[in-house]
Structure formats: structure tokens, C-alpha cells
């Protein structure tokens, strides 16, 4: 199955994701590429563990989905998200048996270390998400990143580093085959939690059809409200940035829709905020369901930014629910 961010719960329950195999081990692979690793690795178990794969490439997502389907691996969920968001928001405490990272982007240029996945904050969250006895597994051809990751794991205070040989399946990935053909080796380490300090999952919420749960406002627009142009507007908070990109008139139902770009750390969402007339003549400003948005502080701020822009056009706010 392919999941959007909005298809998950925060945190989610493995029994909900894998209703037919709820008691099997749960493995997360970060950066699965074209999906070659998991069919090989799953065969080393008596029964295929429940699999969750995260990738940022849409092309890779489709290739891996076909490969896992052809292999008959039905207890697999794939998603296109930043890995940091998935691990922090979706995975419950003490639920994973393994986290697998094969050939991650090393971000080799000077000053780009902050873009690397395997840093102290990630290891601290990973230790919380792994079960006792679980581990994070890294395989990489990049020597400097390997040493960097090992040092970061040790500096996290919650991981022990074990430098061992990689599982054979890790050598079947596209990049492993490339380096093997060139006669080059790979590095592998197991990062084993020494503590499982709880790390909260955060404040994400799925879109709900219940009105009180969806960010909204009720207001009265001026009788002559008929916008002919819209200037891009940027609003910044402590943990988010909202950019109102444009305003569109809707033809079928009347009203308008604002397009907002919302950035919160590693998570970026583009959401629609509708402006529709109600039976009593007031207008409802409300986050639209289109695209499966996740309700976050930044998304609430986007609804607030649209509401405040409308106030600047002469609207009178009757109620704020964001």
C-alpha cells in the first residue's frame, strides 16, 4: 500500500496498519530506492516482517511498490515523506524491531552536515522508537559519512556502535552493486540503544470532518468584496513559515480558495483554504480536505493568515477556530 501523510495517525498503531499480521516484527527502511533490498531481506525470516518504507522520490516509490507487489509482500506500507517527520510523528514509542538505512545521501559538501539524517537528534528519537533488542542498521560506501554517523550515535548518549559486516541483502541494492562492480567496499554498523528515553510524538492531527477539529473562522465580507489581484504574503512564527501564494475564484460553488505554502522544520505542506458563503450570509474560512493535509500549528496559522488578510479587506470576524 502507498500512504500519504494524511493516511497515518499520530502516532499510529501497527495493528491498524497491518490488520492481517499485527504480531509480526515491524521494520522501517529509510530511503528504499527502487525497492531491491526488502524482497531479499524479507526472505531471511520465517515470515516476512511488517514493513514500512519511506522515500522522498516519487519515481522510486512507484518502482518499489511494483517490486514488492511482484514479490508477494502484502504486509508493506510505502510513503513519500521526509524520514524525520515519519519517525518523529508516526512511529510510537518502543514499537520498531529495526530501522534500516542503506546508502543514504552523504551530503558531502562542506557546511552541509546539518542536512544529514544520521545526527544526534535522529538517534535520540530512533532509540525511543526501537524495542529493547532492536537496532538501527547503516550500510554506506561513504567512509567519511560512516565515521560521522558512528560519532554522532556515540554522542547521542543513547546508542552503542557495533561495527560488523552488512547483511547480504544490503549488497543487492543498486548502489551496492555499483560499488561492487568497481571493486569498492562498503561500511556497516549496528546502532543498538542503551536507553529508550521517551520522545513525544508532537502535535500533528489528521484532517477530521468534525467542524471544531478543522481550523476555521466565520466572518462577514463587505458587500463590494470582489478581489481582482492578490500580492503574495509571508507570515513567520517561531516554528513555522506560511506563504500565501495566490487567491482563486471558484466557479461551481462560488467563493474563493487561497493556496498556502507551509514550512515547519522538515515538513512542507501546500494546503488550500476555502472561503465559502453560508446560509446566513456570513462566510466560512476553512482548511480544505483536498490533498489530505495534516493539521499542524503552521496549517492553523495559514487559516489565520487568510482570515487576517480578509480583515484587511474590510471583513468582520465573528468567530475564530484556529
Curated annotation (Swiss-Prot):
GO terms for cellular component: tRNA methyltransferase complex. It is an enzyme of class 2 (transferase). The keyword S-adenosyl-L-methionine applies. It holds the Pfam family Methyltransf_4. Substrate binds at residues 109, 141. Gene3D superfamilies: Vaccinia Virus protein VP39. GO terms for biological process: RNA (guanine-N7)-methylation; tRNA methylation. S-adenosyl-L-methionine binds at residues 29, 55, 105. The active site is at residue 105. Pathway: tRNA modification; N(7)-methylguanine-tRNA biosynthesis. Its EC number is 2.1.1.33. PROSITE patterns: SAM_MT_TRMB. It catalyses: guanosine(46) in tRNA + S-adenosyl-L-methionine = N(7)-methylguanosine(46) in tRNA + S-adenosyl-L-homocysteine. HAMAP family: tRNA_methyltr_TrmB. Catalyzes the formation of N(7)-methylguanine at position 46 (m7G46) in tRNA. PANTHER family: 3-DEOXY-D-MANNO-OCTULOSONIC-ACID TRANSFERASE/TRNA GUANINE-N 7 - -METHYLTRANSFERASE, PENTACOTRIPEPTIDE-REPEAT REGION OF PRORP DOMAIN-CONTAINING PROTEIN. This is tRNA (guanine-N(7)-)-methyltransferase. It comes from Deinococcus radiodurans (strain ATCC 13939 / DSM 20539 / JCM 16871 / CCUG 27074 / LMG 4051 / NBRC 15346 / NCIMB 9279 / VKM B-1422 / R1). The lineage of its organism: Bacteria, Thermotogati, Deinococcota, Deinococci, Deinococcales. The gene is trmB.
Amino acid at each position: 500500500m502507498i500512504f500519504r501523510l494524511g493516511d497515518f495517525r499520530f502516532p499510529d498503531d501497527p495493528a491498524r496498519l497491518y490488520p492481517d499480521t499485527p504480531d509480526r516484527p515491524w521494520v522501517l527502511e529509510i530511503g528504499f530506492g527502487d525497492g531491491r533490498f526488502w524482497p531479499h531481506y524479507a526472505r531471511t525470516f520465517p515470515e516476512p516482517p511488517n514493513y514500512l518504507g519511506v522515500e522522498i522520490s516519487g519515481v522510486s516509490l512507484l518502482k518499489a511498490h511494483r517490486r514488492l507487489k511482484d514479490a508477494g509482500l502484502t504486509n508493506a506500507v510505502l510513503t513519500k515523506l521526509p524520514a524525520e517527520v515519519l519517525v518523529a510523528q508516526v512511529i510510537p514509542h518502543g514499537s520498531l524491531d529495526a530501522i534500516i538505512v542503506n546508502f543514504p545521501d552523504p551530503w558531502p559538501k562542506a557546511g552541509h552536515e546539518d542536512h544529514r539524517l544520521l545526527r544526534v537528534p535522529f538517534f535520540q528519537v530512533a532509540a525511543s522508537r526501537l524495542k529493547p533488542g532492536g537496532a538501527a542498521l547503516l550500510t554506506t560506501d561513504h567512509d567519511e559519512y560512516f565515521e560521522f554517523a558512528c560519532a554522532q550515535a556515540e554522542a547521542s548518549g543513547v546508542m552503542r556502535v557495533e561495527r560488523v559486516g552488512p547483511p547480504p541483502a544490503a549488497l543487492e541494492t543498486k548502489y551496492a552493486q555499483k560499488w561492487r562492480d568497481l571493486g569498492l567496499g562498503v561500511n556497516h554498523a549496528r546502532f543498538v540503544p542503551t536507553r529508550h528515553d521517551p520522545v513525544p510524538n508532537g502535535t500533528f492531527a489528521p484532517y477530521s470532518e468534525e467542524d471544531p477539529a478543522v481550523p476555521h473562522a466565520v466572518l462577514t465580507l463587505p458587500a463590494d468584496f470582489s478581489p481582482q489581484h492578490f500580492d503574495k504574503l509571508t507570515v513567520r512564527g517561531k516554528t513555522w513559515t506560511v506563504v500565501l501564494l495566490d487567491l482563486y475564484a471558484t466557479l461551481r460553488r462560488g467563493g474563493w480558495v487561497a493556496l498556502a505554502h507551509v514550512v515547519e522544520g522538515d515538513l512542507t505542506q501546500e494546503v488550500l483554504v476555502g472561503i465559502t458563503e453560508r446560509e446566513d450570509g456570513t462566510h466560512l474560512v476553512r482548511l480544505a480536505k483536498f490533498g489530505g493535509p495534516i493539521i499542524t500549528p503552521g496549517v492553523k496559522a495559514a487559516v489565520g493568515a487568510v482570515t487576517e488578510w480578509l480583515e484587511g479587506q474590510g471583513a468582520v470576524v465573528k468567530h475564530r477556530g484556529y
